[in-house]
Amino acid sequence: RTAILANEIFNNYEKYSGVSIWVGAAAFTMQLYTDFDGCMDIVLGISECFGIRLPENFSAPFLSRSIEEYWRRWHISLGDWLKNYLFYPLLRTKFFMNLPKKLKGKLSKKGAKQATTFLAMLILWFTIGYWHGGAWTFIIGSGLLHWFYIVSGKLMEPLFVKWRAFFHIEKEKKGFILFQRVRTFFLVMIGLVFFRSATVPDALRVLGRGVSGLGLDWTELMILAVSILFSAWVTIHNQKEDMRVTLEKKSIWLRWIALYALLFYVILLGKYGPGYSASEFIYQNFKV
């Protein structure tokens, strides 16, 4: 039944927007999972009729708390095969063995090792995407996008640790575990929008429809994301040292550039920005 909903929305995405798009994406995600996992269950069942027990190929992937964990639970046989016969042998080739030495001086020892691993992972994830099909929708949706998720997650992990400490978030609390699972499902779902779409431009348009129907276009969404990240960074920085004190230690040119950049940011996106209305100031409705 999910196929009917997914096909209708993806084949006629111009007619839908906002929540409807995400419902269609979720429907296709579940369609793909139940179809693939159901097929494997049939294979396992037939094998057991002949006294052969095959290993499970899925292990509740949508309970995963990260993309890495998701791929340890999804299509397990493919992941194991590619790790053992592509990824690890690739890292043992002469080129990859010598790459950290070539990067010495340009990156730290840890950074050189990370860069080497990330490059090998890029080849691995490109191969995974290509295995699903030669089209760029598969290469991006099942491969490169997941590589980006994993690499960016590893690079930003120190920042995530600081955020959790600042907001007093315990990793094993049920609420945070639920957040991680929903986040992982959503990231997988974005990849499957590419997977399901006929072309990459179609996938981008589908995602655009999903955002526009929420009352935000891509520009506004990026501004919102940058503003939130910047505010979070300043908040965390202020726990160590007041931002004004930090700026006072910088050169006068850097101080003025920072101040004018923030001033124009506020003016262009506030008073003179699109959609601004003085009547929308929230606190005007509250009494002091």
Indicate where each model-derived feature is located.
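Membrane-embedded transmembrane alpha-helical bundles that form the catalytic cores
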Residues: R1-V288
